[in-house]
């Protein structure tokens, strides 16, 4: 199931391990541009390739923009969390693939991520206790077949899935969190 070009849960593509990108081709560059546009058009701060049906390790993130003139998302190819704190803190997160709800989950409050950019440069991203920190982890989870539901405790998950089903029945679209 899709809305606005975004794959919606429980589509099985969101549960797949994504392939490593071996070469940065013009097709990968074009896909990254498409993802940036889709992320912006749907009001997201992050988008992973499986969320548009592409099962490869490609992510776009921009937690800082205020309008399209300031819009310059990061493109992360084959991102890997190389360090993370043991200290977990609660974060409220939403997902373009799970519209209409937000969930409070616990995540490490500090991560270091390594990924390649579109010029094949290895870039190191470090984030602590902010939206960027959550977004990095959330989008990397997508590349390994996990959604925000997997971060929830069992009873929280049951409640969140019910809220999501109700939101879909009301016609929730990507970018809506309540």
What do these predicted ranges mean?
Residues 1-178:
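Positively charged
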């Amino acid at each position: 199931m899709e809305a606005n070009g975004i794959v919606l849960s429980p589509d099985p593509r969101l549960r797949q391990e994504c392939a490593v990108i071996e070469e940065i081709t013009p097709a990968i560059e074009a896909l990254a541009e498409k993802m940036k546009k889709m992320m912006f058009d749907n009001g997201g701060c992050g988008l992973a390739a499986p969320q548009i049906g592409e099962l490869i390790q490609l992510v776009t993130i921009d937690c800082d923009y205020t309008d399209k003139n300031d819009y310059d998302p990061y493109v992360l190819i084959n991102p890997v969390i190389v360090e993370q704190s043991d200290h977990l803190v609660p974060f409220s997160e939403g997902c373009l693939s799970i519209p209409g709800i937000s969930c409070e989950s616990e995540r490490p409050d500090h991560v270091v991520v390594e990924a390649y950019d579109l010029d094949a440069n290895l870039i190191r991203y470090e984030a602590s206790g902010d939206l960027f920190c959550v977004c990095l982890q959330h989008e990397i989870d997508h590349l390994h077949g996990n959604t925000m539901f997997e971060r929830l405790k069992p009873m929280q998950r049951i409640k969140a899935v019910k809220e999501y089903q109700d939101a879909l029945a009301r016609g929730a679209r990507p970018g809506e969190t309540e």
